[in-house]
C-alpha cells in the first residue's frame, strides 16, 4: 500500500468496513459477479423497413437466424440472452454480429440488443418490443451452462387474451390505472417458482411451466 497511514484514518476505516460488509452480504445472497449488462430488446428495423416501404412480405433483414447485434460486447462471440429474473428456462444463446456486419453497424446505432426477424428469440424470452429489457451475458461459463441446461427444452407458448379496444376517455384511463394497481401482483407467483427451484429436487417442471404461464398472464392481464 502506498500510504499505510491512511488505514489509521477513521473515515477510511469506516469506508473499508462498509465495503467489506457489502461484499459479505452479496456473497451470502448467492449473487454471481458475471460479465453482463441490461439492455433493451429491439427488432431488426432494416427488415421492418423492407416490409413497410418495399412491400416485402418475407424481408431478409440484416441478421440471420441465431444472430443478434449488440455493440456493448465483442463481435463474433456467443451471448446468453435472458430475462432477469427469469422464471423457467428462458435462455437464448446467440452469436453477436457487432463489428462483423458493416451495414448492420450503419443501421443499429444504439446500445440495445437487436434480434433477427428469422429467430424465435421473442418466443423464448416472452418479450414484446415496447421497452422490454434483457440481461445479456458474455461470461463463457454462463453461456456454456445455458447451452447445456436448455438442450431439448422448447419455448413455452400459449395464446394470451387481449383487451378490447376502447376510446381514450378520462373514465377509461382511470379504470385502467385502478386495474393496474389492484392486479398485476406477480410477487407471490414468482416466489412459488423460486421455492421450487431452490428445493434441490425439481421433479415436476410442469408446475414451473404453469406458474410461469400464470405469472405472464398476470403481468399482461387484460383490462376489459
Task: Go through each PLM region and give its residues.
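Core catalytic machinery and nucleic-acid-binding channels of phosphodiester-processing enzymes
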Residues: 1-224
